[in-house]
Amino acid sequence: MTLLTMTIDHMLVLAATNRRRLAFVVNQLSGALRRGRPWSRPLRERVLIACTALRTNLTVRELAAIFQISKSTAHRIVATLTPRLAALARTAARPDRRWSWIVDGTLIPTRDHVHAAKSKNYRYSCNAQVLVRRRDLHVIAISAGGPGNRNDPVHYRGSQIQVLCKHHGRVLADGGYRGISELVTPVFRGCRIVRDAVWRRHRRRRARVEHAIGRLKNWRVLRDHRRRGHNLADTLGAVALLHNLSVTLRDNP
């Protein structure tokens, strides 16, 4: 029993989670009945394997060696649970208009070059739009855009994030989103930003989204996405769910 407890604890550390977050995810996923051949590992351990893959970005061979399973089993677990975690994040999303939001874009390096392009980081990347709540860095929505060599407004327009921002009314953004009416951006005069007290206050508040993106990229899968490009949206949703769980359970012990 002691050896089993130590093993679970080591798995939790590797997945950067704790028993409470793991129990929450398992309870949410255990309600849906699944047909087909039963899994050789329980749901709790499969969730740990999927979280470890997102957090560490280990290869299938390395995951199989750590959890003592076959490579095909490790691949099936990650490929099956990642979309379910992303769907759980979309179900749990509850926009709150009491607090201001912040939107920004970031680059996700990808190995699949079909939907990616060389961008300012000199790597093939895809653009991801992130919408967070300024108060606690809770991710309201996250979307996978197109090639990373295009500006943020190109990916923002027509996305679900734009629909949410139009209904909110208090969304901060940087100067790259200039001209979008529903966003609060710095004031320009003569093609230059007016660096006054309003701009300094806006800069301090908008910097919170950079902190949120940095925390999201603690999950190393967003630093080098090795899966197919069409799986990037599910990966982003799963990471957003795990990030929001850490924020929610931290504020409500």
Which role fits each region the language model picked out?
Residues 14, 38-39, 52, 66-70:
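Short secondary-structure transition/capping motifs
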Residues 42-57:
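Short, amphipathic alpha-helical "recognition" segments used to contact nucleic acids or chromatin
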Residues 42, 46, 62-253:
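Short, well-ordered secondary-structure "scaffold" segments embedded in the functional core
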Residues 1-40, 124, 181, 247-252:
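Basic, low-complexity segments
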Residues 6, 17-20, 58, 69, ...:
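Short coil/turn linker and secondary-structure boundary residues
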Residues 8-10, 59, 160:
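Terminal low-complexity, poorly structured segments
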Residues 32-34, 57-64:
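Glycine-/proline-rich flexible loop or hinge segments
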